[in-house]
Regions:
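Non-catalytic, low-complexity flexible loops and terminal extensions
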Residues: 2-67
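Short acidic/histidine-centered micro-motifs embedded in hydrophobic/aromatic stretches
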Residues: 3, 86-89, 169
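Sequence-level detector for tyrosine residue identity
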Residues: 6, 15, 27, 31, ...
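Generic structural signal for individual residues within well-ordered alpha-helical segments
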Residues: 6-7, 12, 70, 84-85, ...
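Alpha-helix initiation/capping motif
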Residues: 7, 12-16, 65, 79, ...
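Generic detection of long, well-ordered alpha-helical segments
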Residues: 13, 17, 21, 82, ...
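Gly/Ser/Thr-rich phosphate-binding loops and adjoining beta-strand/alpha-helix segments
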Residues: 45-115
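Acyl-thioester-dependent acyl-group transfer interface
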Residues: 61, 70, 93-179
Length: 179
């Protein structure tokens, strides 16, 4: 890692001096058994592509000017996450469904850092995801409509209550002796 990635205070902190909050398991700390429910997502549209050797994973990357990206986000009144999610969904729609049509929705998993939502300082892995599900239409859909649908789902799903239910489901399986 590059030395500039850390603040002077972080570099001065000796290894092994973590606080209890930094090493606490956020999943178990915020586990509420009564909130458990089963999560079932509808079948999603599958992108087809070249098969990789030995089941390898393909990762697409892109570089873009941050100022231009932020300007686009402001134009739509969206966060960067909302804008990029809408752009990916719209790209899938434009590329694959305009010519073929599809019966299944576009489904995008968006990773979410749970630390600010639950107010925890754990340095352990503490994340979940929200699933944005967009039904596909057989007609042209403007980007603005996709953006509004994405923003609406972010507002509905990016809540503490939603993630408490997911944590109860996930951490519950860890506490279940049969699993």
């Amino acid at each position: 890692m590059h030395p500039d990635a850390f603040t002077p205070e972080q570099l001065a902190t000796p290894y092994g001096t973590e606080t209890a909050g930094e090493v606490q398991d956020g999943y178990l700390k915020h586990y509420v058994p009564a909130k458990s429910k089963t999560f079932r997502e509808p079948g999603a549209y599958h992108l087809r592509g070249e098969h990789r050797i030995a089941g390898g994973l393909g990762v697409a990357t892109a570089l873009m000017p941050v100022d231009a990206l932020k300007a686009e986000c402001r134009r739509f009144g969206a966060t960067v996450g909302e804008y990029l999610t809408a752009a990916i969904a719209y790209g899938v729609y434009e590329e694959y469904t305009a010519c073929n049509g599809a019966k299944r929705p576009v489904s995008i998993f968006v990773p979410v850092n749970l630390r600010p939502i639950f107010g925890t300082e754990t340095s352990l892995n503490f994340f979940s995801n929200l699933t944005i599900i967009l039904p596909l239409a057989r007609r042209a859909v403007p980007f603005e409509d996709v953006m509004e649908a994405v923003k609406r789902q972010f507002a509905e799903k990016l809540t503490r209550e939603e993630f408490e239910q997911k944590l109860a489901f996930t951490a519950g399986s860890e506490k279940n002796l049969i699993t």
